């Protein structure tokens, strides 16, 4: 069963002069196993939206269910793993081992089961066991993010929810996180990420949700998103669309620089071949 939001609204500072409608009549469905990107400008309501998925916030109106359960149930706390933008704000233990084991211990798993989950999560984020005794705060930004991710994975969630997981990381750190998330999704866990980094995430996304001023203005597949008007696109995709509009026979559904280069060279070769054949016919 999926995460379902039905006619959900949420207000900050309700019934005060500072009342702000963060979400308005939101309807959303996220299936197990999907890789979902939640897009939108700052203040659009993205972070508020994902906090409804496991009961961190309570909607003012409407209904939220996770696999048919209330988001405030203990089982949903296990089902929906959360990873916030700043990993350092989520880490507090003295060692990587303690950090990853924290969730299973608090859910009452045995020592043996907890250790199995720690090693499983460690492997999922591509760390070896030598990391377990390291101080989390001695690690790089990308490594800290992976420790926080391992902590969430130790509960074997059905849905992994992330808020800007690669913001502030260097290129190597971004690459590590993106590869890890793809691996997690391929193993059957739904990955739901708030992101501004279309360049990094777009090739991975299966479903896109666009939030504008507290409302969902688009939800659909990546292919449907590319056909939609007035939606933000990765720079390379915008460039390919512009080339197509100017008459070049390129495929505009390109998401990476590597794909764009390959497509441009393919079209260049084709046009040169056609030009040569035309000259041959003239001769």
From Swiss-Prot:
Source species, domain of life: Archaea
GO molecular function, one term: ATP hydrolysis activity
Cited Gene3D superfamilies: P-loop containing nucleotide triphosphate hydrolases
Topology of the protein relative to the lipid bilayer: Peripheral membrane protein
Compartments reported by the entry: Cell membrane
SUPFAM superfamilies for the chain: P-loop containing nucleoside triphosphate hydrolases (SSF52540)
Chain sites annotated for binding ATP: 40-47
EC number: 7.-.-.-
Keyword Nucleotide-binding: yes
A cellular component annotation (GO) from this entry: ATP-binding cassette (ABC) transporter complex
Keyword Heme among record annotations: no
Short name of one Pfam family: ABC_tran
Boundaries of every ABC transporter domain copy: 3-238
SMART domains named in the record: AAA
UniProtKB keywords: ATP-binding, Cell membrane, Membrane, Nucleotide-binding, Translocase, Transport
Similarity field: Belongs to the ABC transporter superfamily.
Task of the protein: Probably part of an ABC transporter complex. Responsible for energy coupling to the transport system.
Designated name of the protein: Putative ABC transporter ATP-binding protein MA_4342
Organism: Methanosarcina acetivorans (strain ATCC 35395 / DSM 2834 / JCM 12185 / C2A)
Organism lineage string: Archaea, Methanobacteriati, Methanobacteriota, Stenosarchaea group, Methanomicrobia
């Amino acid at each position: 069963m999926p995460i379902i939001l039905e006619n959900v609204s949420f207000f900050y500072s309700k019934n005060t002069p500072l009342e702000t409608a963060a979400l308005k009549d939101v309807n959303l469905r996220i299936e197990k196993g999907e890789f979902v990107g939640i897009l939108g400008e700052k203040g659009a309501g993205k972070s508020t939206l994902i906090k409804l998925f496991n009961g961190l916030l309570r909607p003012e109106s409407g209904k939220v269910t996770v696999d048919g359960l209330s988001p405030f149930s203990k089982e949903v706390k296990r089902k929906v793993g959360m990873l916030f933008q700043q990993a350092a704000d989520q880490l507090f233990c003295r060692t990587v081992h303690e950090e990853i084991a924290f969730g299973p211990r608090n859910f009452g798993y045995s020592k043996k089961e907890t250790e199995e989950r720690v090693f499983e999560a460690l492997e999922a984020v591509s760390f070896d066991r030598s990391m377990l005794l390291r101080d989390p705060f001695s690690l790089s930004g990308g490594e800290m993010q992976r420790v926080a991710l391992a902590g969430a994975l130790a509960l074997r969630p059905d849905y992994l929810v992330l808020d800007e997981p690669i913001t502030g990381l260097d290129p190597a750190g971004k690459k590590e996180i993106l590869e890890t998330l793809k691996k997690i999704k391929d193993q059957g866990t739904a990955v739901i990420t708030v992101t501004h980094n279309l360049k990094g995430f777009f090739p991975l996304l299966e479903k896109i949700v666009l939030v504008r001023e507290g409302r969902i203005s688009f939800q659909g597949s990546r292919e449907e998103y590319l056909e939609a008007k007035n939606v933000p696109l990765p720079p390379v995709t915008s460039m390919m669309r512009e080339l197509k509009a100017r008459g070049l026979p390129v495929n505009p559904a390109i998401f990476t620089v590597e794909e764009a280069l390959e497509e441009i060279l393919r079209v260049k070769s084709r046009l040169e071949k056609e030009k040569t054949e035309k000259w041959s016919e003239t001769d």
